[in-house]
Amino acid sequence: MRPMRIFLNDDRHVMAKHSVVYPTQEELEAVQNMVSHTERALKAVSDWIDQQEKDSGIEQENPEPEETETTEEGKDSEAKTGENPTRTLRGVMRVGLVAKGLLLKGDLDLELVLLCRDKPTISLLKRVADNLVLQFETVSEDKYEVVQNIREASIVIKNTKEPPLTLHIRLTSPLVREEVEKLSAGETLTVSDPPDVLDRHKCLAALASLRHAKWFQARANGLKSCVIVIRVLRDLCTRVPTWEPLRGWPLELLCEKAIGTANRPMGAGEALRRVLECLSSGILMPDGPGLYDPCEKDASDALEHLERQQREDITQSAQHALRLAAFGQLHKVLGMDPLPTKMPKKTKIEIPIIDYTVQIPPSTTYAMPALKRPIEEDGEDKSPSKKKKKIQKKDEKSEPPQAMNALMRLNQLKPGLQYKLISQTGPVHAPIFTMSVEVDDKTFEASGPSKKTAKLHVAVKVLQDMGLPTGIDEKEESVDESEEKPVLQTPSQTADSEQADSSAGDQSESGKQQGPILTRHGKNPVMELNEKRRGLKYELISETGGSHDKRFIMEVEVDGVKFQGNGSNKKVAKAYAALSALEKLFPDYTTYTEAPKKKRPPMMPRGGPKFAGKHNQGFGMMYNEVPPPQVMRGRGRGGMNRGRGRGRGGFGGGNYGGYMNSGGYGGGYGGNNYQTSATAGYSQFYSNGGASGNAGGGGAGSGGYSSYYQGEGYNAPTPPKPFVKKPPPPQQQQQPPPQHASNPPKPSYNQGYQGHQGGQQQQQPQQQQQQTYNQNQYSNYGPPQKQKGGYNQGTQGAASAGSYNYSNSYTGGTACRVRQWRGCRRARRPALTQRQALVTTQGRTPAMVQPAVPHRTKVTHSRTTIKVPPDRTTAALQIITSPLREEQEVMAGIQITT
């Protein structure tokens, strides 16, 4: 499994640090020589002691009660050693760094454990040490110094050359632990110990180190990256004093626990980060879970020797190291310089692969005991799927390595050949490359769907010319030929079948490079067979080959006949099986044509009753509850759905209420309202409490709501203006209504730019007309024109903060005039729905005006009913209705009701 990509940089740093701290080959050879020489010398000492005992006829007494009362653990330990229990020295075992393979550069202390039949004594230690000096002279030419350390119950051996190594041989016996267990169980000992017996605690520690070595070899050595991480952390414990108390057995247990509980193999960088996460979680803290020692019968904490302050310091240091690793600064934790992001390309140098797990080969002097009992495989526990996977793995291992292809063979025979691209033909999706190579003054050319395939075909030609094997698998060719035989059986299409057979043979040779497998009709065989026979099932018959070159055989049953196909994947195998079935069962089938599809009815306009058309109803800020009727598509600016002039529609176009009902945000494209003020579009909702001096905000005759809440007021809808290339005739100036002296007119936020109007836009005391972009913004950027009196430019004399803003109304002394568009064009006048507009009387009392709907084809002057609340006095009101070109003003009669 590939390591996770996010930890690749950490993996590089950890492996670089590991290569620095890993001992050199010379150091490992020196350790190997010293350990092997000592083991051979101890074997000779054991033989010498045995021979002396046999010659003298004196054997050490083994009391019968002691033999009969040995515990099961003692019997197991004797069985594990595999040595003769009658020998005084039963065997020597490697422990510590040597057995676990955790040696670092500069580690000079080595350990061995010498197992004795009885409890080791001082006399036995001296006897072994004295004879060991003599045996070293016969075993090796190297000089070794032997020192007796009775206090530590060990023999110390030192070499006399570089590097200066020190080897400790610790004497112990399984009887020491058996005696301790008896005492803890409350039993009395019937046999007294010799007076010169060695320290019991030292012997127990030697036995524990032996158990630790066996456990480590069984559990930690098999974990990926575990040994590497332990070596790196051992170096960290040496460099950082805070981590020093964790060095040794607790560190090994911790790393095995953190890495062994992962659900997948991890790289070195990810494994190190997982160990840091485990430490940062507080496993060392006094109230934490602790670290169980698996090599002890009684439950014991392997961290009991750590003090509280040491636990906190290590946890804090691990948390800091984890932060550095998270921010890409793992090199600071490892004590190294950061590596470059991109390594320079170097020529490959053959370097012998180093096995980082096993540093020193096992001993050949003594037969090493079995690390664990053999696994008892029970048929009930093993699932069939696991057995199948194991069988497949065994088959993959037993398969011979794949042979070289033609290109590899040719490169070995003729290194340094230059392949040239001659031409590239064919369409973009299926190119054909032609490559050439010159070998021995001969030029060979071949084609293929890719440059790599073309080079391979060229190599095949060269090898065939040289009379050498090309590396093509003949077995695959024979299988593919047998699959293509049904094509040859059709007598009516002999020539076509021969061509198909040759093309199929080419496809079988290089199926991966030839693209999809198709029938003679250019269809996928599986799809075409499914058109003939529905519900076919393809079964996987076999799966062979390694992970890099698998072969699948699929089978399909059609009309009681089974057809097989093979390929590099299941899809290709299914295609070949279907192709074989088609050629066998349907040799003369005609081209399949699909039935004409039924024409579907036209789609209804999107939306429900609330949104009758695509763009006839805006739904951004607010909308009408009753949808207006759908109108024919307009041709001018701001049409219903689309327009062909400037400003085509937008959201809601100009006929109905979209965003602000003037086409787009704040009078956008539909009504040509490119407003530039800070309150454009939404100013009528928020600026000045809903009342501004001008009826701006929504645009010229804007159909947007003039107040924030729906239903409190509505402006008369504005049909779009026709697109006319020549400038329109000047409009008649309208007399503004009289103003109150106490309320001067206020400037509008939406009056637009007036910089190009020249001197024709002078302010008049009696009439302050303010032109906005809402009537025709394009005229402002042309040459100076005559000022036009547009709609939505009057002022409100009676408006004040908090009152309503009526964008199309003029308020005056006792009368109020409402301007209303009558039509859009002469020939086509869009229908106006019945609306309700607000007008004001002299006392600023809201009254509802209900104009009648004008007809589409002719101008009518209808009556308008104004409803005034009964508690207010009524007054005669005049409504001035004007057509598009304002040729005349028509006065309509009004009826006032209470």
Curated annotation (Swiss-Prot):
UniProt biased composition (Basic and acidic residues): 72-81, 374-384
GO CC terms: cytoplasm; nucleus; precatalytic spliceosome; ribonucleoprotein complex
Top-level taxon of origin: Eukaryota
UniProt cross-references to InterPro entries, sorted A to Z: dsRBD_dom (IPR014720), DSRM1_ILF3 (IPR033099), DZF_dom (IPR006561), DZF_dom_C (IPR049402), DZF_dom_N (IPR049401), NT_sf (IPR043519)
Stored PROSITE patterns: DS_RBD, DZF
Protein name as catalogued: Interleukin enhancer-binding factor 3-B
Subunit structure: A component of a ybx2/frgy2-containing mRNA-ribonucleoprotein (mRNP) complex. Also a component of the CCAAT box transcription factor (CBTF) complex.
SUPFAM superfamilies listed in its UniProt record: dsRNA-binding domain-like
Free-text description of this protein's post-translational modifications in UniProt: Phosphorylated. Phosphorylation affects nuclear translocation. Methylated by protein arginine N-methyltransferase 1 (prmt1b) in the RGG-rich domain. Methylation decreases DNA-binding and thereby decreases transcription of the gata2 gene, but does not regulate dsRNA binding or subcellular localization.
Function: RNA-binding protein that plays an essential role in the biogenesis of circular RNAs (circRNAs) which are produced by back-splicing circularization of pre-mRNAs. Within the nucleus, promotes circRNAs processing by stabilizing the regulatory elements residing in the flanking introns of the circularized exons. Plays thereby a role in the back-splicing of a subset of circRNAs. As a consequence, participates in a wide range of transcriptional and post-transcriptional processes. Binds to poly-U elements and AU-rich elements (AREs) in the 3'-UTR of target mRNAs.
Coiled-coil region: none
Residue ranges, compositional bias (Polar residues): 489-513
GO MF assignments: double-stranded RNA binding; mRNA 3'-UTR AU-rich region binding; mRNA 5'-UTR binding; sequence-specific DNA binding; single-stranded RNA binding; transcription cis-regulatory region binding
Pfam families the record matches: dsrm, DZF_C, DZF_N
Gene Ontology biological-process annotations: defense response to virus; regulation of transcription by RNA polymerase II; spliceosome-depend formation of circular RNA
Biased composition (Low complexity): 749-782
Main location group: nucleus
Composition bias type Gly residues, residue spans: 637-651
Lipid metabolism is among the record's keywords: no
Feature: compositional bias, Acidic residues: 61-71, 474-483
Annotated keywords: Antiviral defense, Cytoplasm, Developmental protein, DNA-binding, Methylation, Nucleus, Phosphoprotein, Repeat, RNA-binding, Transcription, Transcription regulation
Residue span(s) of domain DZF: 5-379
Subcellular location(s) of the protein: Nucleus; Cytoplasm
Motif (Bipartite nuclear localization signal): 372-390
Ranges for region Disordered: 52-87, 374-403, 468-529, 627-651, 711-799
Organism this protein belongs to: Xenopus laevis (African clawed frog)
